[in-house]
Amino acid sequence: MLALGKLLELTLTDHEPAEKTQVTPKGARLRWLGEGALEVRPAESEDCGLDLLLSAGIHGNETAPIELLERLLHGVANGKIKPRARLLFLFGNPVAIRKGERFIEQDINRLFNGRHELSSGFEALRAAELEQFARVFFSKPGRSRLHYDLHTAIRGSKIEQFALYPYKEGRKHSRRELARLAAAGMEAVLLQSKSSITFSAFTYEQLDAEAFTLELGKARPFGQNEQVNLDKLEERLIRIIEATEPEGESSLDGLQLFSVSREIIKHSDSFHLHLPADIENFSELSKGYLLAEDLAEMRWVVEEEGARIIFPNPKVRNGLRAGILIVPDSGQRLG
C-alpha cells in the first residue's frame, strides 16, 4: 500500500508525508496537496475527461462517508481500482474529524460562496482553503466536472439516503445526473430553488460542476457504521472512477423528487420550533400546523399540500436556516 493511499491515517495523526507524489501499480499518480487533500491523475492515455471531486468530513462526526472515501482511495493506491477520471479526495474539517465532533467553532458547511469572508477562526480559513482546492482542480477547460459532498445526518430520516441538488439561475437540473443518483442508491432528491452557502452549492454555482450533497444515513463513530449500507453508492463511484458506467441511463424509477417550498429562518433567541426533538427528516406535516414562532409575532404555518420537513434544528445561530419545508415535485423542469 502506497503511503499516500492512507490519507485518513495521515489526517487522523496530523502527519505530513515525506513523499508528496507516488505512482500506483496501474500508473495513476497520487499527489498530496495539503492536509486532508489528495489528487489522483490517471495515466494520460487512460484519461476519460472527467474531473471528480469527492469530499467528506465537512462535519467531523460523519464517519461513514469518510470510511467510504478511504476504501476507494485504498483501491486506487493498491491497483484494484484503475482510475480513468481525474480525482480529488478532500476531508473537509480535519480538526473536527480528529476530535469526533460535528465542528469546533462553527459549521463549515455554512461558510462557502464567500460567507467565510464575513467570519473568522480556523473553520472560516478552512472553508476558503477548500474553495481554493476545488477552484484549482476544476480549472482545466474542456472537461466534465462532478462533485459529490458526502454526509450523514444528525437525526433519523423517513428516507435514509437522499441528495440535495443546488440551484443556479438559468441552469436546469440534469435528468442524466438524477438517473446516475438513482443508480447509486439515492431514494430522493431535493431540487433547490435558491443560492446556498454549502460546499456543493459553491462548486455548482461558481465552478460549473454538477454538484450534490449526499445524505447517507445516521452519523455514527468510526467503526460503527454497519447499519449504513453504501454498497450501491460505492459500486457506482467505482464505475464513475473507472469510466465503466452503462451508456444511455435515464431511468428515474423509484426516485422521489422534492422542491423547496420555504426555508425556516431563525431570527432571534425567542425562536421556537413546534416539533418533537426526535422528529425524522421527511416527516409529513398537515395543513394548518403551526411550525414555528419568533419575535414580532412571526409565525410559520403549513399551507402546502404534502409538506414535509427536513433538517429541523432550532439550535442554529440567529440568521441561519432552522429547517426546510419541502413538497413533492413532478420533475417537469428537468433538463
From Swiss-Prot:
Keyword Acetylation part of the UniProt annotation: no
Entry EC number(s): 3.5.1.96
Catalytic residues as annotated in Swiss-Prot or TrEMBL: E215
Pfam family, one: AstE_AspA_hybrid
Pathway annotation: Amino-acid degradation; L-arginine degradation via AST pathway; L-glutamate and succinate from L-arginine: step 5/5
Cofactor: binding comment: Binds 1 zinc ion per subunit.
One Gene Ontology term from the biological process aspect of the record: arginine catabolic process to glutamate
UniProt entry keywords in alphabetical sequence: Arginine metabolism, Hydrolase, Metal-binding, Zinc
CDD domains linked to this entry: M14_ASTE (cd03855)
Keyword Translocase: no
Catalytic activity annotation: N-succinyl-L-glutamate + H2O = L-glutamate + succinate
Binding site for Zn(2+): H59, E62, H151
Cofactor needs: Zn(2+)
Molecular function as annotated in GO: hydrolase activity, acting on ester bonds; succinylglutamate desuccinylase activity; zinc ion binding
Function field: Transforms N(2)-succinylglutamate into succinate and glutamate.
Family, per entry: Belongs to the AspA/AstE family. Succinylglutamate desuccinylase subfamily.
Name under which the protein is recorded: Succinylglutamate desuccinylase
The species this protein was found in: Pseudomonas putida (strain GB-1)
Chain's gene name: astE
